[in-house]
Amino acid sequence: MRTPRDTPEITLVGAGLAGSLLAIFLARRGYRVTLLERRLDPRKKMPTAAPASAGRSINLALANRGISALEEVGVMESLWPALIPMAGRMLHDEEGRLRLIPYGNKPHEVIYSVSRAGLNTLLLNAAESTGRVSIRFGETVCGVDFADRRVRFLADGDPERQTQATLYDVLIGTDGSASAVRAAILERTGGRLDEEPLGHGYKELTIPAANEGGGQFRMEKNALHIWPRGEYMLIALPNADGSFTATLFLPNQGEESFQALTTPEAVDALFERRFADTIPLMPRLGEDFFGNPTGHLETIRCEPWSFEDHALVLGDAAHAIVPFHGQGMNAAFEDCSAIDRCLRDPDRLWNEVFAEFERRRRPNTDAIADMALENYIEMRSTVREPKFQLKKDLSFRLEERHPRRFIPRYSMVMFHTIPYAEAKRRGAIQEEILDELTSRAASLDQVDLARADRLIAERLGTT
């Protein structure tokens, strides 16, 4: 069995966000890194524009966990100018009325809209600039031979489509929710794969900039816009060019579902009925709806994440989650930081490194998977209820009174690096306290704050 000290090179499968960031971490540790990526180089202009792959959002929400990992490798200074801060959720009701619900209780508690492509380009460039990272594009991994440490792949442009192979010392799969490395690990170990489809899908749409040259926004740019409609919702995140990327989340089947929207007339009717204020904002609604793929939503959990001293998976390859807490990318970036910490002792065996990483991360990735599912209900439905706003206001008040003991769960997840499992545990206690305090209150001034202080001391006193 080998150690990190006697392993000069690491092979990564997948040069997306997690893979490119992990390559930087590993290069900084002194490793030579080879990245195998099925796509062609996204930084090069292609002869014809290819449609975005289903399941790959145009823009993402960057929060404190992701920022912390990016700061560790020194790329945040270059990224800040490309980010758009979002201070809260801008709710659009069915009458077109707007209401902003701040994310946090402090001015700096914001999340950021970031371009997936722009961030990937930044990370790929940073990885190559280390001088230790080689990226091989157009190579689709199709299997792993653990006996002789070979990765099998198909090379783009090979007219014969013959399987080729490359040797590896240590293999890490950062190849997303359909991971070939994960499949190989589970086949070799007889492991477990749990795929939990949500029963809802999503479609990306566009709200173009207000002016032809771009740069002018049709709505408030420093907010994440939500049209909550009970069983489904529409959201929109701002882009640097003045446009918004809107995402429609709908059930896959049913009266109001993707299955039912088979004609432009049906799409128009749904939007006129439930999202009327967006009609003037989306001149290409029909074109976008039928031109863009419908994305699939599911939670993926697997066990184990590694095989002996050979291979490991992380990010979506190990624990894909639904997007409703904006934490898929952030959790993957936190994975990169976590495996880097596990590598601080170069004399430990690789299988020990992998085991420690999984022991540390699995409870936390399970927790954020659960919280992401819960947040979908909040975003599409609960957020409309008066009691939600009362509990939100009360949670901020209690945070002011007990800043070290009472931190809203959303804030723990988005603005801190408190482990996800701990945020979930503390959040459950806090939710019980909020329920008790608001059970007979219609407004904040009717809440018994002295009782709140006692409950927090009793239940969160040692937290």
Task: List PLM regions with ranges.
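Conserved mid-domain beta->alpha element of the FAD-binding
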Residues: 15-24, 28, 172-173, 205, ...
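Glycine-rich FAD pyrophosphate-binding loop
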Residues: 27-55
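Conserved FAD-binding catalytic core of PHBH/FMO-like flavoproteins
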Residues: 125, 139-143, 148-297, 301-307
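A short, Lys/Arg-enriched amphipathic alpha-helix followed by its capping loop at the start of a domain
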Residues: 22-31, 69, 130
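Conserved Rossmann-like nucleotide-cofactor binding loop
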Residues: 18, 41, 178
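C-terminal helical "tail/cap" subdomain of flavin- and related membrane-associated enzymes
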Residues: 3-5, 341-463
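Residues at the starts of beta-strands that form the adenosine-phosphate
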Residues: 9, 32, 329
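Conserved N-terminal helical subregion
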Residues: 2-10, 63-204
